[in-house]
Amino acid sequence: MQLRDKLFINGAWTAPHGKGTIDVHSASTEAVIAKIPAGDEHDAAAGVAAARAAFEGWAATPPADRAAFLAKINEGLKARSEEIGKTIAQEVGMPVKLAT
């Protein structure tokens, strides 16, 4: 079982203000395959504030630079595609091949 205990807010993994967790279930077995932080209104407000603060800078970034940044994100997702695909397949009950 995977245990994630932080939220990604403002470019960093941070401990959530909220103390609860959410169980992620396998669609086929209903077993708990992961636990993720539930967060609360303070966590949501921090995420929204970070997004608002970043918006003007992102909007002013030249399109070529934004494209390069998105290409790096794509590389990271491709590098983890097997892990991500397996998690999605378990959670929604689809074949791994379709989830990757």
Predicted regions and their residues:
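Terminal low-complexity tails and localization/encapsulation signals of metabolic enzymes
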Residues: 1-36, 68, 72
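Glycine-rich loop-to-alpha-helix module at the N-terminal edge of alpha/beta enzyme cores
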Residues: 33-100
